[in-house]
Amino acid sequence: MTQIIIAGAVGLLVSIFVTPVLIRRFSAEGLGQEIREDGPKSHLRKRGTPTMGGIAILIGITVAYAVTGIVGQVTGTGGLTASGLLVLGLTLALGGLGFADDFIKLYMGRNLGLNKKAKLIGQLAISLIFGALILLFPNADGLTPGSSHLSFLRDLPTVDLAIGPKAVGIAIFLLFIYILISAWSNAVNLTDGLDGLAAGSTAIVMGTYTVITFWQFRNSCSAGAQPGCYDVRDPLDLAILAAAGLGACLGFLWWNAAPAKIFMGDTGSLALGGLVAGLSVASRTELLMIIVGALFVLEAASVVIQVAGYRTKKIRIFRMAPFHHHFENGGWAETTVVIRFWLIAAVAALIGASIFYGEWLSLTGV
């Protein structure tokens, strides 16, 4: 528990102190966000607000995880693990892809950033590497950081994605990992449209997964097979990483809350989407994350519905998508939308955590 608290505290402090440094640097260089002319008119006042603040989040997460790992090594209570390093690597890699996108927008004057093909190739390459490595590095119990089984509250024994001939099974599993990572990174990216919305919502998800993975650690099968125990490799390290993400998001939110002094940019949103996806795979709760991160799912779904409605029927289901803009254009103040969406995110996270805990109770008979 001490390591989790340290990770959260260090992540928060690093993020909250690094962010204003970025604000001053980017403001001095005139590196501000361009605002879509077809977006909500109230957003035009945000033109010129510094972006790429996700750098502070990534520094916060990395420093917090590293410091906690060093403390664990020194005290003999643990250290860096394959699971934690792989999820952190995924987060940083997607953050790097987002940084390239932001860099092109700001330094090269190309408003759309990376083209769709480059983003697709980048996400595909990162996903394939993560998917290949997640099934390696077994521990003494033979557990690898990830599993080829689809998972809800734990692995579903009857749903093994690596079915059929070995090559086919590997291809199916890697395709699933790509879809998962692409979906979550894009969903968080779409949610990052209002001051504080993505940072606050991600903090809620990270807080929930800090609790879930710590519970997996407390009831790990590695401590002796008992009813309801979890076959998850390195759950404590995952809890530490989630806590680091929680702290870093809260530190950034201090400056990103309305009126935002800086935006996280694709550097932050793609990275946080990767962190969400990576934690779901490593904790073997991919389907549960859909409930816990339901706000991100709804935001992404609103875009899909809007595009489908216009392409098939030439009608717009929402005033504007993602649907946080639908409510803005309906007269809600930006802060009202953000707070109410945080409430939705919190309720979804509570439902997901309750289902997780309820399943454990049903297996243990407590």
Swiss-Prot record:
Chief site of localization: membrane
Xref: Pfam families: Glycos_transf_4, MraY_sig1
Bilayer-spanning residue ranges: 3-23, 52-72, 80-100, 120-140, 161-181, 197-217, 238-258, 262-282, 287-307, 341-361
InterPro entries reported in the protein's UniProt record: Glycosyl_transferase_4, PNAcMuramoyl-5peptid_Trfase, PNAcMuramoyl-5peptid_Trfase_CS
BP terms from Gene Ontology: cell division; cell wall organization; peptidoglycan biosynthetic process; regulation of cell shape
EC number: 2.7.8.13
UniProt catalytic activity: UDP-N-acetyl-alpha-D-muramoyl-L-alanyl-gamma-D-glutamyl-meso-2,6-diaminopimeloyl-D-alanyl-D-alanine + di-trans,octa-cis-undecaprenyl phosphate = di-trans,octa-cis-undecaprenyl diphospho-N-acetyl-alpha-D-muramoyl-L-alanyl-D-glutamyl-meso-2,6-diaminopimeloyl-D-alanyl-D-alanine + UMP
Cofactor(s) needed: Mg(2+)
Membrane association type: Multi-pass membrane protein
HAMAP family to which the protein is assigned, alphabetical: MraY
Protein name (database record): Phospho-N-acetylmuramoyl-pentapeptide-transferase
Species assigned in the record: Corynebacterium diphtheriae (strain ATCC 700971 / NCTC 13129 / Biotype gravis)
Source species taxonomy: Bacteria, Bacillati, Actinomycetota, Actinomycetes, Mycobacteriales
